[in-house]
Design a protein with these regions (language model features):
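A short, conserved beta-to-alpha structural element at the edge of catalytic cores
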Residues: 29-39, 156-176
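C-terminal helix of von Willebrand factor
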Residues: 112-115, 173-196
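Conserved ATPase-coupling elements of RecA-like P-loop NTPase cores
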Residues: 14-15, 144-146
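Von Willebrand factor
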Residues: 47, 55-134, 140-144, 165-176
Length: 196
């Protein structure tokens, strides 16, 4: 499962809280179903996070196993065995991850996120072939170049399912120009808080 999370400024506030809750529920569901879950957050730039690796590291930490990021490898790496265990026998190698949702801010561009999504669908050793893809966004995203949209349709035709969760104000009247590229888009409407 790929989750593409819009972290642009338009998702600040209530949409941010809704998406944070959705990510937590998706993590739990993916773990219950024993499915990989990969998060790509995007605004102008992108960042990819393996949510299942993050959860596994958190569980290991709770039972007393120290997790060592590859960026924190000690200079005296001779103290590590060939299987990556620290000299105490309690270290575990992993790629750096994050422990919280990304910062919300900036504009929105789907180009980099789509390139990263396509790369993972193509080049991840058949691990994510035909994976389900879920976008959590307000879909106020400028259309990328036509060749990217054509590629999007190719994936859809070959079995990849694309879903969206559109988070918008209850008075939103903007048409969703992305709907033809997705199998289904669910809409969550919220009423903005009024301050008197």
């Amino acid at each position: 499962l790929f989750v593409c999370l819009d972290t642009s400024a338009s998702m600040y506030g209530t949409p941010e809280r809704i998406s944070s809750t959705l990510i937590s529920l998706l993590e739990e569901t993916a773990e219950d179903l024993d499915r990989d879950c990969f998060l790509i957050d995007f605004s102008v730039s992108t960042r990819a996070i393996d949510l299942m690796a993050k959860r596994k590291a958190e569980r290991l930490k709770r039972i007393g196993i120290t997790v060592v990021d590859s960026t924190e490898i000690p200079d005296n790496s001779a103290d590590l065995s060939s299987d990556g265990q620290a000299h105490t026998g309690r270290g575990v190698w992993r790629q750096p991850t994050t422990t919280h949702l990304p910062f919300i801010g900036g504009g929105t561009s789907a180009k980099k996120m789509m390139n990263q999504m396509f790369d993972l669908l193509d080049n991840d050793g058949l691990h994510y072939v035909n994976a389900d893809v879920l976008w959590i966004t307000d879909f106020l995203i400028p259309n990328p170049p036509q060749q990217m949209l054509a590629r999007f349709k190719e994936y859809k035709e070959t079995g990849t399912r694309f879903y969206g969760i559109r988070i918008v104000r209850d008075d939103d009247k903007e048409p969703n120009e992305w709907k033809d590229y997705f199998n289904w888009i669910y809409t969550i409407k919220y009423r903005p808080l009024r301050r008197y």
